[in-house]
């Protein structure tokens, strides 16, 4: 049985729950956009946008327009690489209900004809 941790210290470490959620989402799914992140965690769209913009200005994230959507990704740098290692290790010890609720969403449609 794996050890499980509380999310509370992580929220404090990153300064806010929305900052914590944004970074954990991007680490788990590799990319994302503001409304997708906001909908997953039931936070306001503006909070997700503020956090994404803040992390982009700090140099942790990069974004690009894909169609009409601004997608965010981790920037390749020693700082963001170290942060991602930390975030991945935290994802590995989150409580199982939290993992199921937030970090195991279907990202593609089901194959046609699958039963």
Identify what each model region corresponds to.
Residues 8-19, 33, 66-88:
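Short, cationic-aromatic polyanion-contact patches
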Residues 52-53:
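Short, hydrophobic-biased segments on the C-terminal half of alpha helices
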Residues 46:
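Key DNA-contact positions within bacterial/archaeal DNA-binding proteins
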Residues 4, 79-115:
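Amphipathic alpha-helical dimerization/coiled-coil segments
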Residues 36-40:
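A short acidic, leucine-rich amphipathic alpha-helix
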